[in-house]
Structure formats: structure tokens, C-alpha cells
Regions:
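Membrane-embedded alpha-helical bundles that constitute the cytochrome b-like, heme-associated redox core
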Residues: 1-213
Length: 213
């Protein structure tokens, strides 16, 4: 069995199931099977889905550095799945807030989005992630052409906005937001350094060609 066959029939189903475990845990906790949601179940669900949404954004952002460092190009075959799971958990986070916390009170929802800054930036991250999820298919990629790549660069903004949203929401203990912020800085910093080295190498090679000519 070659690598591509293993990925398609073994590793992709395994990764899909692993990505689904946090959602299954939330269902189990809601029914008291795997635990409980505590005194404030709505807040517990919001935190659970929001945290996992942010984690999957960071995991998706880690795919490119892992590929470049290890040389294992096959890891990119999981990037779309990881990105869609990031959207799934952020969507669940949003729906819990919309349906259970706000009870679909449109005026209260609008007031929160426009008057509470941490919700404003969280909603902006959700909209960007929604646009990327809606255009994640191969057909949309062909249809949008170069604009597809430009749109999907928004994942960097999503990461920044999501960490900012979480940091602003936490009132006392910022340990977790600080961990996520550090990981995001590492992931984005790696890209900046890698891009700078790539540009530097190209200039160096161009200079060498001019000298030899």
C-alpha cells in the first residue's frame, strides 16, 4: 500500500475521528456521560468550542512549517480538513452564543457585536473563517483563481483576531491566551523568517548569475 492510499483510507479517517473527539466530549458532558458542564453549562460549552476552534486554527497554521522543516509534503493533504474543523468548532461556539446565551435576541446580538469590542473582533474572525470554509472546495479554487489564495491568506488575520478575542474576554488569568499568543507568534514568525531567507537567496543567486555573466 503506497503513501497516498494509506493517507486516503487509513490516516484521513483516523484524523477525522480524532478531530471529532472534542465535539463528542461536549455531547457526552451535556448528557452526563463523560463528565458535566458545571454550574454554567452555556459558558462551559462556549469556552469548550471556542478553545478548540482556536486550537484547530493554530494546528492548521502549523502544517506549512511542519512540511518545510520535515520535508514530508503529504501533511498538506490534511490542511483543508483541519481548517474545516476549525470553522466547525468556531461555528459551534458562535451558535451556542447566538441560540443559548442570547436566545436569538436580535437587538441584544447587534448591540453586543457593535458595542463590545472583544465580540466585534471575534465576529470578524468568524466571518473571515466562514468565507474560507465556503470557498474551500477545488471548484471554488479554480473559479476564484488568484483571488482564492489572497482570500485564504486571511487565516493569518483569523489567528490574530481569535487570540485577541480570547485575551480580551479573559478577565483575570491570561495563562491560556498567552500560550496561544506565543504559539501564534512562533508560527507567524517562522513564515516571516522563511520568506526573508527565500528572498535573500533569490537575490544572492541573481547576483551570482550577473557576476558569472
Amino acid at each position: 500500500m503506497n503513501t497516498l492510499t494509506q493517507i486516503r483510507f487509513i490516516w484521513k479517517p483516523a484524523v477525522f475521528f480524532a478531530c471529532l473527539l472534542p465535539a463528542l466530549q461536549a455531547v457526552g458532558d451535556a448528557f452526563g456521560v463523560t463528565g458535566d458542564l458545571g454550574a454554567n453549562p452555556v459558558e462551559a460549552l462556549q469556552d469548550h468550542f471556542g478553545n478548540w476552534g482556536l486550537r484547530f486554527v493554530l494546528i492548521a497554521l502549523a502544517v506549512t512549517p511542519v512540511r518545510q522543516i520535515t520535508g514530508r509534503n503529504w501533511v498538506t493533504r490534511f490542511r483543508r480538513m483541519l481548517g474545516l474543523f476549525a470553522f466547525f468548532y468556531v461555528l459551534m461556539h458562535f451558535l451556542v452564543w447566538l441560540l443559548l446565551d442570547q436566545s436569538l435576541n436580535i437587538s441584544a446580538i447587534g448591540a453586543d457585536i457593535f458595542e463590545r469590542p472583544f465580540i466585534t473582533i471575534g465576529f470578524a474572525a468568524f466571518l473571515l473563517l466562514s468565507a474560507m470554509a465556503a470557498t474551500s472546495t477545488n471548484g471554488m479554487r479554480r473559479r476564484l483563481g488568484r483571488r482564492w489564495q489572497q482570500l485564504h491568506y486571511s487565516v493569518y488575520a483569523v489567528g490574530i483576531l481569535a487570540v485577541w478575542h480570547y485575551w480580551w474576554q479573559v478577565k483575570k488569568d491570561v495563562t491560556e491566551p498567552l500560550i496561544y499568543a506565543t504559539l501564534l507568534i512562533i508560527l507567524l514568525g517562522y513564515r516571516v523568517v522563511h520568506h526573508w531567507r527565500h528572498v535573500h537567496d533569490r537575490k544572492k543567486k541573481a547576483g551570482a548569475r550577473i557576476v558569472t555573466a
